Regions:
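Residues in well-ordered beta-strands of folded domains
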Residues: 36, 49, 81, 121, ...
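A broad, low-specificity signal marking well-ordered, structured residues that form hydrophobic/aromatic
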Residues: 33, 46, 78, 118, ...
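Catalytic core of membrane glycerolipid acyltransferases/transacylases, capturing the structured
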Residues: 42-108, 114, 124-141
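Helix-to-loop junction immediately C-terminal to a conserved catalytic motif
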Residues: 22-52
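Hydrophobic alpha-helical segments of integral membrane proteins
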Residues: 18-22, 26, 91-94
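Non-catalytic C-terminal accessory region of glycerolipid acyltransferases
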Residues: 1-16, 109-265
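A generic local structural motif
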Residues: 33-36, 65-67, 105-106, 205-206
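Short, structurally constrained coil/turn elements
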Residues: 29, 72-74, 213
């Protein structure tokens, strides 16, 4: 893997503008999405740190993106640090034009140093394939690189918490053993082959993906965190990560307690 940053100009604002009506329809009509306090994302560069839900049909990015562009306007660029799996085959230019970048430190630095906003999901595939018993748990699988990235680029962390996306289908297992048997880490850089149950295919092993249920997705943007101001010039990375997750978990717990029924919200 190269350490050279991707070309940020591959993002096509006109293409993003054409996608937005479709994304708005999907997020607002099917998922009844609600994003609270999007205005907390400050001007300039910022690293948006979110939990990740929905498996192969994760809707975190469309939900956040629609709210972001509706509030800040389409002229403010938004980038997403994503798994290598999205950049294989003919799908690569599609995601690049939408502002997706491989989740590397070089790409994060390039966006943040340009004054841009980028979304990162530290938990990645581990998080989005979590079983239903962990639906309302913030777990980054021990990954703390996002803290170092914010420090290196002197930008705030903006925690974001979402609930409902993991209810789009029933996630039974991450399928680690199956993925190991199929050598998916070597082929696709993932250790998981999720076992899910949904409509119309019933029990599936990642493919074919089931139609996501119209679960209500509620997303809360937390107050930005100036890491140096709160933790000092040379903070303990693990301490910062633990505090970020603690704040996110507290909000997720509140959202879960306010949620009356699965899927319905």
């Amino acid at each position: 893997m190269t350490d050279e940053p991707a070309d940020l100009l591959l993002r096509d604002p006109a293409y993003v503008a054409r996608l937005l009506p479709l994304l708005r329809l999907a997020t607002k009509w099917w998922f009844r999405s609600e994003v609270r306090d999007i205005d907390r994302i400050p001007d300039g560069g910022a690293l948006v740190v979110s939990n990740h839900s929905g498996g192969l049909m994760a809707m975190d990015v469309p939900v956040i993106a629609v709210a972001f562009f509706d509030h800040f306007g389409e002229d403010r660029p938004l980038f997403v640090l994503a798994h290598d799996m999205l950049f294989t085959g003919p799908a690569e230019p599609v995601f690049q034009r939408a502002g997706f970048l491989k989740a590397t430190r070089a790409n994060a630095d390039a966006v943040l140093q340009s004054g841009g906003v980028t979304i990162v999901f530290p938990g990645g595939d581990y998080d989005t394939f979590r079983p239903y018993t962990k639906n309302n748990t913030v777990d980054f699988a021990g990954r703390t690189g996002y803290v170092r990235t914010a420090l290196a680029n002197d930008v705030p962390l903006v925690p974001v918490v979402s609930i409902g996306g993991q209810e789009a289908q029933l996630h039974l297992s991450r399928g680690e053993q199956l993925a190991k048997l199929l050598q998916l880490e070597r082929l696709l850089r993932t250790r998981y082959m999720p076992v899910t149950f949904g409509f119309p295919f019933g029990l599936t092993f990642a493919f074919p993906p089931n139609l996501p249920l119209p679960t209500k997705i509620v997303t809360q943007v937390l107050e930005p965190i100036d890491v140096r101001a709160e933790f000092g010039d040379d903070p303990d990375i693990a301490e910062v990560d633990a505090e970020v997750r603690r704040r996110m978990q507290a909000v997720l717990d509140d959202l879960a307690s306010a949620r009356r029924f699965p899927v319905l919200g």
